[in-house]
Amino acid sequence: MKVYGVNELRKMYLDFFESKGHLKLNSFSLVPQNDKSLLLINSGMAPLKPYFTGQEIPPKKRVTTCQKCIRTGDIENIGKTARHGTFFEMLGNFSFGDYFKHEAIAWSWEFLTEVVGLSGDRLYPSIYLEDDEAFDIWNKEVGIAPERIFRMGKADNFWEHGAGPCGPCSEIYYDRGEKYGCGDPNCTVGCECDRFIEVWNNVFTQFNSDGNGNYEELENKNIDTGMGLERLAVVVQDVDTLFDIDTMKAIRDHVCKMANAEYKVDPKKDMSIRLITDHIRSVTFMTSDGIIPSNEGRGYVLRRLLRRAARHGRLLGIQGKFLAELSKTVIAESKDGYPELEEKKEYILKVLTIEEEKFNKTIDQGLSILSEMEEALVSNGTKTLNGEDAFKLYDTYGFPLDLTKEILEEKGFSIDEEGFKKAMQVQRETARSARAVTNYMGADASIYDEIDPAITSNFVGYDRTSHTSKISVLTTETDLTDEVVGGQTATIIVDETPFYATMGGQTADIGFIVGKDAEFEVEDTIKLKGGRVGHLGTVTKGSFKVGETVTLTIDTQKRQAIGKNHSATHLLQKALRNVLGSHVEQAGSFVTSERLRFDFTHFSALTKEEIAKVEAMVNEEIAKNVPVVTDVMSVEDAKKSGAMALFGEKYGDSVRVVTMGDFSKELCGGTHVANTGSITVFKILSEAGIAAGVRRIEAITSNAVFEYYKSMEEELHEAAKVAKTEPASLVKRIESLQEELKTALSENEKLKAKLANNSLGDVMNQVVEVKGVKLLASKVTDADMNGLRNLGDQLKEKLGECVILLASASEDKVNLIAMATDGAMAKGAHAGNLIKEVAVLVGGGGGGRPNMAQAGGKNPSGIDAAIEKAVSVVENQIK
C-alpha cells in the first residue's frame, strides 16, 4: 500500500466525491453561524444543520467537505494519552434528499480500497442490528462475507438526538494487526484495544423520532458521513498514534527541537510534548477564525489552550516566547488545505505573541505564590486550596482557575470552586463601587461603605423623566451627613430615581433635584454597591436633609440624544454581523449624547465598501421607523427568543429584551428611543483597530450628523473660495490646478536641464586623468539630486570611460553623486566607496553600487575638500 500524507489524503477524498457529483465546499469557520447550541464547531455535520433541518436550501443536494473541528470535553486527557486531541479535521460527504445507502456504502468501499489502497481483507463493516437493507448491500453488492459484517445495538450504530431526524449507522473498521492488539486471541471489532480502529461512519437519516420511541419514515432521506482525517492517516501511514502522522510529527519534532528533548524517552516530557503539539494546532486555527483570547466563551477556550501550552513549554525547559514560532510550522503544514492560514499569518502570530507575553509577565510570580500555598496545605494537613487563595492567583497573577486546578491535581490537591466564585463576586462589587467613586472628584470609597446595607434605590426612569422620592442618604466628599447646604459638593441617594447611572457603556443622566426652596445640580449618576444609585453634584440653592421629599428631573434633551445613540449601537452590531459575519461580537461600547463608540471582534480593517454597506443597512432600518419594543422575561425565555447576550455577563432572574422589528433583538438594560425613526440618520466617522482582533467604530446620529455635514459644507465653501471657484466646480478646479502644477514642474525641469547643459561646458574643462582613467570631480550650482543624475549621464556620454563626482549645495543641504563606467570599474573604480570617503567631509554619509552612488550632507563649506579628495581616493582604487 502506498503511503499518503495528510494533505494528499484530504485532496484525494474531496476530489473523489467531487467526481461523484458532489459540490466541494471549503471548511466552515470554527465559530458557529447562527447556532447558539454550540460554542465551537465540533463535527463535520454541525455547520450543515440548516440544510438537514430544511431551514435553508443547500447549494447542491450533494456536498463534500473537510471540516476543521474543536472538542475540549476531554481536555484533561490531552497529552496524558496519545489518543486524544482537541483539534481534528472531519471528512464528510452529504446527501440532502438525493442518494442513500447503496451509493454511500459503495463509494465508501471504493474510496478506501481503490483510491487509498487499503486491503479489503482488513476492513470490517458494522451495521445496526435491525438494518437488513444495509446488511444486504454489504453482503450482496460489495461482497463482504456475512461473518465479517457486525450487527450492533442502538448505542453503537443508531444516531439519535432526542426528537427529530435520526437513523441507523454503518461503520467501517480497519484491522491494524496483532502488534496493536490486546493479546486476546478472540480480539475483534468492538474491542477497546487499538487493533480494530473505526475509520468511516455512514449515518442513514431515514426516520423522524417523536422522542417517545416512535419512528416515522422520512420522505426525504439524508446521508451524513464522517471520517476523521487524522485517524485515516494513522491507518494509511501505519503509525502508532495521531502524534506520529506526518503533519503532527513535524510539529512534534519542532517542539522537541525547541526543548532539546527526545520523544518517547521520558513519559513526563512526552505528555508535555503531545499537549503542546495538539494545543498549538487549536490555537492557530481558532485565532485564524477571528477568536481572540478573553475570559469569556470561545475566547476563554482559546486562552486556556494557549496558556496550558505555554506552561508545558516551561516544564520542558523552553525559555521565553515560543508559541508564535511553533505556529509557523502549523501554518506551513496546513496551508495547502487552509490557505487562509498563510493569509492571516501575521495576525495569528501577533495574537499568540501578545497573549504569551501577558502570561509570561505573571506566571513566574504566580507559580512561586502557588508553591507557597502548596507548602501551607501540606503543613496544615489539608488537600483543598480555599477559594480566596485560588481567586488571588486568578485576580493578581492572571492564573485561570482551570490552570491552578490542573497544577494542583498533578500533585494530589483540589480547589474550593464555590469559594472561588464567591470571592469573584465580592471583587466585582468592590470594583464597581471603586470605579464609580473614582469618577467623582476622587472621593474615598469608605464614604459609601458606611451606608446602611439595607438602603437601596429603585430605578423608575424607563417610562418617566421626573419623579418624587425621599432622600435616604446624604454624603459630602468626606463624610455621611444629615444635611448639605449651598455651595457644597455632595452625593444624594433616594428611594426611587428616574436617573440612569453609568452602566453597560451608556453614560449617566444629568439634571436637577428640587426640594423646598432648594436646588441641586446633578452632574453625574453612579451605580453603587447594593443596588444604590448616587446622584453626584452641587447644592446651588438652599439645603437638603435626610428624609425630605424631593423631585428629581432628568435633562430630557440629553436622555433623548443618548437613547438615539444607544439604539443605533444595536442596529450597528446587527449590521456588522450581517456584513462581516457572525464572528462579530461586542467587545465594548461607550454611548454619550454626542456620539457612540462600538468595539467589536474582527480580524481586519473594514473596506470602504463594507463601511458603506453597514452604514446603509443601519439607515435603512432607521427609515423603516419600526417601534423599539422592550419586554421583560426570564433569561431562558430571552435566549429561546433569539436575543443576543454578552458572553460571561451575569443576568438576574428577569431581563429586558430590546427588539427593533425583525432586525435586532438584544438583552439590554439601557434606555432607548420609542421607534427607530427617532434616530433620524446614522453616520460612521471612523473605523480603526484598537487591539489584536478588536476594531472600533465611532459614529454620530440625528442632529450631530446635520452639524457634521454643515461643518463639512462650510469647509467646502472655504476651499472653493481659496481655489477661486464655486463648490460645484471645485473638483474640476482642483484637476485644472493639478495640470497647471504639472506643467509648471515640467517647465522647471526643462530650465534645470538647460542650466545643467550650460554647466556642461564649464565642468568639461575640469577633467583630469588618474592612472589612465578620466576623472571629473566638480561643483555644480542650482541642481538637486535628480539634476545631478541627469548631468552625470550626459557627462558619461561625452567622456566615455570615466569616473564622475558631482556636488551641489542648496542653503544648508549638500547633494553628492558618483558614477563609474564599466571600463573604469574594470580597473578598480568603485562609486560607492568613493562616495563613502568624501561624504564625511560635507557632514554626511552614503554609499551605493560600484557604478552609481549618492549621499547627502549638511556642511556646504566642505564641498571643495570633498572634490579635492576625489583624486586621491580614485588613485588608490585604480590598480
Swiss-Prot record:
Report the Pfam families cross-referenced here.
Answer: DHHA1, tRNA-synt_2c, tRNA_SAD
Q: Molecular function terms in GO for this entry?
A: alanine-tRNA ligase activity; aminoacyl-tRNA deacylase activity; ATP binding; catalytic activity, acting on a protein; transferase activity; tRNA binding; zinc ion binding
Enzyme Commission number, as recorded: 6.1.1.7
InterPro entries according to UniProt: aa-tRNA-synth_II/BPL/LPL, Ala-tRNA-lgiase_IIc, Ala-tRNA-ligase_IIc_anticod-bd, Ala-tRNA-synth_IIc_core, Ala-tRNA-synth_IIc_N, Ala-tRNA_ligase, Ala_tRNA_ligase_euk/bac, DHHA1_dom
Main localization is: cytoplasm
Q: Residues that bind Zn(2+), according to the entry?
A: 566, 570, 668, 672
List required co-factors.
Zn(2+)
Q: Which GO terms describe its biological process?
A: alanyl-tRNA aminoacylation
Matches recorded under PROSITE patterns:
AA_TRNA_LIGASE_II_ALA
One GO cellular component this record assigns the protein to is:
cytosol
The reactions it catalyses are: tRNA(Ala) + L-alanine + ATP = L-alanyl-tRNA(Ala) + AMP + diphosphate
- Which subcellular locations apply to this protein? Cytoplasm
The record describes how the cofactor is bound as: Binds 1 zinc ion per subunit.
Q: What is the role of the protein in this entry?
A: Catalyzes the attachment of alanine to tRNA(Ala) in a two-step reaction: alanine is first activated by ATP to form Ala-AMP and then transferred to the acceptor end of tRNA(Ala). Also edits incorrectly charged Ser-tRNA(Ala) and Gly-tRNA(Ala) via its editing domain.
Family of the protein in this entry = Belongs to the class-II aminoacyl-tRNA synthetase family.
Q: What is this protein called?
A: Alanine--tRNA ligase 1
